[in-house]
């Protein structure tokens, strides 16, 4: 196995909360997949959840080498958690297509947050 992509992103939670207050759920719908949006709607700390998902998706797009561009959208990345709470990243759409071209076999995702910031790192291995 070899690392074929590495991406990290940091999001300011307050900035995400301000975007939510301006545009409401429209901002969340732009970032989140359907399953993520359903979970988001149940939460009290929506801004924190969205900041972590935003950072993870930006990190994944950087690891892919495209950013959110060239046909890759936020909806191409879905973050869920396994039974132990470990974050899991699933690719779809253009991101999945590009990952197959790069022979990506393993995806590693870590997400962390503290009072002001959320940070995520993604590693793609062949």
From Swiss-Prot:
GO terms for biological process: fatty acid biosynthetic process. Its EC number is 2.7.8.7. Its cofactor is Mg(2+). The keyword ATP-binding does not apply. It is found in: Cytoplasm. Pfam families: ACPS. The lineage of its organism: Bacteria, Pseudomonadati, Pseudomonadota, Gammaproteobacteria, Vibrionales. The gene is acpS. This is Holo-[acyl-carrier-protein] synthase. InterPro entries: 4-PPantetheinyl_Trfase_dom (IPR008278), 4-PPantetheinyl_Trfase_dom_sf (IPR037143), ACPS (IPR002582), Ppantetheine-prot_Trfase_dom (IPR004568). Keywords: Cytoplasm, Fatty acid biosynthesis, Fatty acid metabolism, Lipid biosynthesis, Lipid metabolism, Magnesium, Metal-binding, Transferase. Belongs to the P-Pant transferase superfamily. AcpS family.
């Amino acid at each position: 196995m070899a690392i074929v992509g590495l991406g990290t992103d940091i999001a300011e939670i307050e900035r995400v909360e301000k975007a939510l207050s301006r545009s409401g759920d429209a901002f969340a719908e732009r970032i989140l997949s359907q399953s993520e949006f359903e979970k988001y709607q149940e939460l009290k700390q929506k801004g924190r959840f969205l900041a972590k998902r935003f950072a993870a998706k930006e990190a994944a797009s950087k690891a892919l080498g495209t950013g959110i561009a060239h046909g890759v959208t936020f909806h191409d990345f879905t973050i869920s958690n396994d039974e132990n709470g470990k974050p899991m990243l699933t690719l779809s759409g253009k991101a999945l297509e590009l990952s197959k071209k790069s022979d990506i076999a393993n995806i590693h995702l870590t997400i962390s947050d503290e009072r002001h910031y959320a940070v995520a790192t993604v590693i793609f291995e062949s």
